[in-house]
From Swiss-Prot:
Residues 293-311 have a biased composition (Basic and acidic residues). The keyword Magnesium does not apply. The modification Phosphoserine is found at residue 312. Disulfide bonds join 89-145, 182-240. This is Embigin. One of its GO terms (cellular component) is synapse. Glycans are attached at residues 55, 62, 70, 101, 118, 191, 198, 216, 221. Its main location: membrane.
Length: 330
């Protein structure tokens, strides 16, 4: 009788237990981790992120709030790139602070209490600290510490640096060239972009494909847009946009393009008034001169004046006569 070999031997009577043991031995151990399991790679990724953010700079800001603060105390926190942020609120009161609580909010939404919060009480001073990492634009916004039922608060406005342009409208004339300028004080944007506004949206300006525009800047924190051969339709709104690691900031500039007839309009109006006044004076002179040279008109005027004089004299002469008659009758 032939002996069974290979798998046939394993499935023969008496060997089912051995087969199960072999299958269990070849099955991967869950404790060792599955390379396709996201939890298997989460730990190294987190360690890499922590190592990446460990070298970030620290931005620390403080706000002092008292029980007499009727309005929110605000502080601007300007960030160009990812940073560690430490926000601290110090509340001072004259009464006991044992029952005083503090709540942190972002854009008026309560933040979850984690190990990043630290609140201490000492005497009549309550100090609350919130420390976290800002690494994207979604973390920008308003962070507020709210104290007690009266909701006395201090607010930190976290945002990227602001670009600044000319506040007043820039006036230029048809055919000329003009320069629009934007500056970012104490900051270095990664990139500058110019846009022209129309009725519906902002249109990017491509200086490489259109010789009408020249974009340059002598420093990294400023940008200049030169527009050549101006037309009236070139007037309108222009935006300069500064790009940072954490977001963007833009500023609006207004350009007014006038034709050369526009400055002459006030002078033309004055000239029209002068011409009208001279015409009226000439008409008066002509009428007066014509009146002097017309003798018939003068005679008629004299006759009318003579008749008026005679009528008045006749009335005056009749009155004394009536008085004499009355005296004779008596």
């Amino acid at each position: 009788m032939r002996s069974h070999t290979g798998l046939r031997a394993l499935v023969a009577p008496g060997y089912p237990l051995l087969l199960l043991c072999l299958l269990a031995a070849t099955r991967p151990d869950p404790a060792e981790g599955d390379p396709t399991d996201p939890t298997f790679t989460s730990l190294p990724v987190r360690e890499e992120m922590m190592a990446k953010y460990s070298n970030l700079s620290l931005k620390s800001c403080n706000i002092s709030v008292t029980e007499k603060s009727n309005v929110s105390v605000e502080e601007n926190v300007i960030l160009e790139k990812p940073s560690h942020v430490e926000l601290k609120c110090v509340y001072t009161a004259t009464k006991d602070l044992n029952l005083m609580n503090v709540t942190w909010k972002k854009d008026d939404e309560p933040l979850e209490t984690t190990g990043d919060f630290n609140t201490t009480k000492m005497g009549n001073t309550l100090t609350s600290q919130y420390r976290f990492i800002v690494f994207n634009s979604k973390q920008l916004g308003k962070y507020s510490c709210v104290f007690g039922e009266k909701e006395l608060r201090g607010t930190f406005n976290i945002h990227v640096p602001k670009a600044h342009g000319k506040k007043k409208s820039l006036i230029a004339y048809v055919g000329d060239s003009t320069v629009l300028k934007c500056v970012c004080q104490d900051c270095l944007p990664l990139n500058w972009t110019w846009y022209m506004g129309n009725e519906t949206a902002q249109v990017p300006i491509d200086a490489h494909s259109n010789e009408k525009y020249i974009i340059n800047g002598s420093h990294a924190n400023e940008t200049r847009l030169k527009i050549k051969h101006l037309l009236e339709e070139d007037g309108g709104s222009y935006w300069c946009r500064a790009t940072f690691q954490l977001g963007e900031s833009e500023e609006q500039n207004e350009l007014v393009v006038l034709s050369f007839l526009v400055p002459l309009k006030p002078f033309l109006a004055i000239l029209a008034e002068v011409i009208l006044l001279v015409a009226i004076i000439l008409l008066c002179e002509v009428y007066t001169h014509k009146k002097k040279n017309d003798p018939d008109a003068g005679k008629e005027f004299e006759q009318i004046e003579q008749l008026k004089s005679d009528d008045s004299n006749g009335i005056e002469n009749n009155v004394p006569r009536y008085r004499k008659t009355d005296s004779a009758d008596q």
